[in-house]
């Protein structure tokens, strides 16, 4: 019904079809439902700890693989995971992240500072968004990206991620 309504409205406004003789265009989509293992074990030279899926971490991916498995992967801390030449900032400088998992902080380095012009201060820039961090990690050759959540710089509690990312998501079909 919605498509019929929109098509009727377009015609009544005198708009010409934009896809040959049709007002409609097929948009192939894919549905992805990420599910994490129940545990993630992290080992460091100083010890190890275990994170519980959904309670301590959630996952997300736009990859359409049937299964993505990370086992015995190397983690590399990459600050905020940002390359921003206009701010003379490069968290990846001198880091080898190829085929590793980068761990980055949420938001950007301007948050909580006194300079409102540095990464726009407390106003999150595109560099602070999760999508940018995933894209930059991929550009740097990383296998994946883990974003460390912190409620204050994120602007929302972890429960928002638990509620929103534990469900199916629609993406354009690659």
Describe these PLM feature segments.
Residues 103-104, 144-148:
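Short hydrophobic alpha-helical runs that function as membrane-insertion/retention elements
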Residues 38, 100, 134, 143-144:
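Residue-level detector of short, conserved catalytic/binding motifs and their immediate flanks
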Residues 109, 151-152:
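Acidic glycine-/aspartate-rich tracts in secreted/extracellular proteins
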Residues 86-90, 128-135:
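Short, acidic/polar
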Residues 11, 135-139:
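Non-catalytic positions within long, well-ordered alpha-helices that form the structural scaffold/packing
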Residues 1-115, 157-163, 169-173:
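Noncatalytic luminal/extracellular "stalk/propeptide" segments of secretory-pathway proteins
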Residues 115-124, 130:
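Proteins synthesized as precursors that undergo proteolytic processing into mature forms
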